[in-house]
Amino acid sequence: MYEENSLVGKILNERYEILEVVGSGGMATVYKAECKLLNRYVAVKVLKDSLRYDLDLKEKFNKEAQAAAKLSHNNIVSIFDVGEIEGLNYIVMEYIDGITLKNIYVIISL
């Protein structure tokens, strides 16, 4: 079992060093990480621990990765990897640094 911040500082799958929490939703937490093999930043989406035994949700999570991996467009992040290790289901994708959609909404609302 893990808590969101407990992955920070850990290395996932001997490859992705988890640096910080980027955001969290009902299903998953997204982290900024560094891929040690390719020396680049990536985003790692990890299925919440409380959902790890929900087989339907795990299947949905994996299908999300497969569907997104088939897409190629400048406005869609690329999927680099997907997997499960020690009960953690994860998707590794392109990391985009910048302002979030939530922040844009707050600015526009002012």
Positions of the model-derived regions?
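Protein kinase glycine-rich loop
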Residues: 18-25, 30
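Flexible N-lobe loop architecture of eukaryotic-like protein kinase catalytic domains
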Residues: 23, 63, 72-75, 88, ...
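Conserved N-lobe loop of protein kinases adjacent to the ATP-binding glycine-rich P-loop
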Residues: 34-41
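AlphaC helix of the eukaryotic protein kinase fold
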Residues: 48-70
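Activation-segment/catalytic-loop signature of the eukaryotic protein kinase fold
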Residues: 82
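Conserved short submotifs of the Hanks-type protein kinase catalytic core
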Residues: 86-100, 104
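Activation segment of protein kinase catalytic domains, centered on the conserved DFG
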Residues: 106-110
